[in-house]
Amino acid sequence: MNQSFVFNYGKLVASNLDSDALRLVRADKGLLIWVNLFAPTPEEATSILEDVFSFHPLAIEDCLAVSRYPKIEDYEDYLYLVMHAVAFNKEDQFRTTELDLFIGKSFLVTHHSEPLASVTSTIERIQKNPSSIARGMDRLAHFLLDTMVDAYQPVLNDLTNEIGALEDTVFLSREPEPTVIREFRERKKELSDLQQIVRPQRDVANRLARGEFKLIRPVLLPYFRDLLGNLNRIETTAATLHDQLYMTLDVFLNKASYETNEVIKVLTLLTAVTTPTLLIGTWYGMNLKMPEYEMKYAYPIAIAIDLVTTIGMVVWLKRKRWL
């Protein structure tokens, strides 16, 4: 499916045009066009990307393929960007969605395979008040990216709450659930995925903010610097959460190790205390005739030796403060 919006001096003058109409609009340099491709068929993608806009084959190939890492490429007449939105789905699973952008002087083409809240909110903004963001394709692209980055905050809040709950489980529970390690692994993967896309996105924003590309007007540079600042803050928060997660993991492992050592200590002490009795029982349990068996008080003496050695072992362990 594709949506198209045509602007003239900040006003929305047409929408949802077919490929032939878009070619005619492209010929009028006074009009601005935004085409949004949402999960297009191969025919729709080819019609727009190749036939209408004549983008470079390598850029089209990258656009239609899945890319894990954000990037920006300059094709002189337009910029090609790969960015990623993040969210939690209905099953509370962290996921990322790729957004491809072709930014030209008079056009913006976006492509994504899944619904994006930033695109939806931008379309709603255009339909209500297009003049605020539709006076330039660089401004429209910034609004899209800024809205997308703003959506990172709820994800960070969810991750913060999940790691906080994990901390409570580790610090407050006498015996943490066996699922703790699985929770650690899932949170670690989510944070790693987030950091893998935030770092290169920050680099993309940095290049946009420092005026490297002629298609980004100087008046927009402060806005892209603000976008860069937001990404820096997100990266810092993600790094802090990553450290917090590993600190909690260290506490959990130390706690588990301590509890294991306590169990081993108890078993070792039991073994030490009962060793004299076991030795005596083993010695006199041999199937041999011993002179002691003929003694009148052999049995009471054996019991007494057992008790004395056991009590002596307990006293010795207490003096060593091992018990």
Language model segments and positions:
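Hydrophobic alpha-helical transmembrane segments and their immediately adjacent juxtamembrane loops
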Residues: 229-323
